[in-house]
Amino acid sequence: MKPFDFVKPDDQEGVISALAAHSPRVRILAGGTDYLVELKHVSQSPGTIVDVSHLQELRGIEEVEDGLRIGAAVTHTEIMAHPLIEKHVPAMIHAAHTIGAVQTRNLGTLGGNLVTCVPSMDSGPTLVALEAKVTIIGPGGSRCIPLTDFFVGPRKTILEPDELLIDIVIPKCNLGKPTAFHKFGLRKGQALALVNAASSLWVKGGKFKDVKISLGAVAPVVIRCPKAEASLEGLPISQDVIQEAGRIAVTEAKPIGDFRASLEYRNDLIEVLTRRTLNSAIQTANQS
């Protein structure tokens, strides 16, 4: 491991000052489940590491005026056990349960999973399907943007070296919205997704309303499928239209073939998981 400087500020303002002072050779440390592994293999020192794991401003899950706020340093285990998540967005519990092993979920944070920005991340699709927003602070102040705008490419977000992700907010209008997440990997546990998917929707008079479909591991970043969504809007619920939406979703994705799965196999998974998430969300809607 290469030598580096270590800073542990007392608050958010101290973090921003430290990031600005040491930019661009600076990295943020929260759970460290990805970065500490990476750090052992880098060819040069990262410069300065800024520890934010202890900051209470980045913790907590609470209802706010705009919706449900989840601090960026909240762990996956905390998400799985929190009553507000169970009440408003239970699909997040299912997604969090598929992330890594128990130790990874105990240490790894929601913000870290998003910032790492691996296309196969399991936290992304559910949040994208629920139109989540993220809050970023930096020397110039704060900004709130859609999560879909946060992702730029594999392991690349819009965060500047002197900026910090502080929370994720699920809009109030989507709290309690029937949502489902499904993942397919090579193993039942501790597996990267070959494809993962989430769908959210309302059912009004037996018809689809406000459908959102999101896919992971099928493009450089987690994506929405607006054409598949539009194909369902306002239509009576039937397996025929759900199957057609799955076929349309395939055309909106850009999967690759690699040693884990061929392009053709991933296309099949896109269609299947789109159908499964839609049907699961419908089932949730019918039970509510």
Q: Language-model features: where?
A:
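C-terminal structural segment of proteins
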Residues: 1-288
